[in-house]
Amino acid sequence: MVGFGANRRAGRLPSFVLVVLLVVIVVLAFNYWSISSRHVLLQEEVAELQGQVQRTEVARGRLEKRNSDLLLLVDTHKKQIDQKEADYGRLSSRLQAKEGLGKRCEDDKVKLQNNISYQMADIHHLKEQLAELRQEFLRQEDQLQDYRKNNTYLVKRLEYESFQCGQQIKELRAQHEENIKKLADQFLQEQKETHKIQSNDGKELGRNDHGAPKNIPNVPENDANKNEDPSSNHLPHGKEQLKRVGDAGMPGVEENDLAKVDELPAALKKPPVLASQHESHQTISHLPTGQPLSPNMAPGSHLNQNENPSTSKQNPSNPLQHIIPGPNLDREPRIQTDTLKQATRDRANDFHKLKQSRFFDENESPVDPQHGSKLADYNGDDGNVGEYEADKQAELAYNEEEDGDGGEEDVQDDEERELQMDPADYGKQRFSDVL
């Protein structure tokens, strides 16, 4: 090869070399540029790949953690599955037991349906009985209203009769007191007349004393006292009888009666019997032998028959008999007591009938008046019928009155004891005993 400094041909060779060199340079530059650009791209891709590797590493760590967690979850799920299987076994056994119970319940349901049909029939029967009982209850209410009306009517009737009895007793007492006053005045007048006659007869007997026969039987003073003492003995007894019979259970009237009896004249309370005993004894000793002395005759009446018959007809044989409560006066209180007793017996019979219709129903079984239900028997037997104690006593008293074997006296004593009460209280007590 020739160096650069040698001589060459001018115009061809250098330009070709330069062109080739330029082409090579261009190619190399292009290659460099392409390689450098590719290198940059590759670097970028490497960086991206490194980032992806990092991300994948992070994701791998996460996945590993998640895998471990999932493994734990799998273990727990396995345990839960095992537990669920055990629960399933238990539930299957329970289900079988429930199925058995369901079968038994179905059997019981069938039985209950059969029982329901019977119970519906019983309910229908009980409804019919309830309707009958309601009708019976309404009938009992109607009877109760009727009994209450009868009760009020009987109470009013009893009060009215007791009031009438009280008025009649007051009228009879007033009449009796007027009769006593009239008899007292008559007795005083007759006593004055007898004193005058006895004084005149005493003078005539004093003249004829020596001419009287001596064979007259001596009458002792006790006989004279017996003839004269009944006035003093029977007068208080008459007061007591008037007080016992006349009041008829009126306390206020009884006090008035005692006050009026105390206001009687002194001649009625203390008759002059003791003062005339000596004179009567003298007149009796001078009686003739042929004329006996009557027990009810006054001492001066026999002399009046011998000497003055006209005066003996005007004057009674014994003036004290008008005051002494004799058989006539005793008969009047007896009539009053008999009428009162008869009225009380009639009331007792009415109350007894009311009682029987009140406490017994149509089947002759006792009924409670407050609740309207039948009372139970004593021993639970159908043959035994319960009775009230008041019914027994009323029936015994009624039987004793019908038999007449002494029970009437007890009933009369009870009635007299009840008549001494207030009429209103008597009526209430009698009616409460009946109810």
UniProtKB/Swiss-Prot annotation:
Q: Which spans does this entry mark as compositional bias, Acidic residues?
A: 398-417
Lumenal face residues:
36-435
Main subcellular localisation: membrane
Q: Where found in the cell?
A: Membrane
Modified residue annotations for Phosphoserine: S232, S365
Transmembrane helix among the record's keywords?
A: yes
Question: What membrane topology term does the record carry?
Answer: Single-pass type II membrane protein
Where in the chain are disulfide-linked cysteines found? none
Give me the Cytoplasmic side stretches, as residue ranges.
1-14
UniProt-annotated stretches for the region Disordered:
191-239, 271-435
Q: Where is the composition biased (Basic and acidic residues)?
A: 191-212, 223-239, 343-361, 425-435
Ranges annotated as spanning the membrane: 15-35
Query: Per the record's keyword annotation, is Cell inner membrane included, yes or no?
Result: no
Q: According to the UniProt record, list the residues that bear N-acetylmethionine.
A: M1
Q: Which residues form a coiled coil?
A: 35-194
Which GO cellular component term is one of those annotated? Answer: membrane
Q: Where is the composition biased (Polar residues)?
A: 282-294, 302-320
State the source organism's domain of life: Eukaryota
Q: Which family does it belong to?
A: Belongs to the GOLM family.
| Name assigned to this protein | Protein GOLM2
Please name the source species: Mus musculus (Mouse)
Its encoding gene is what? Answer: Golm2
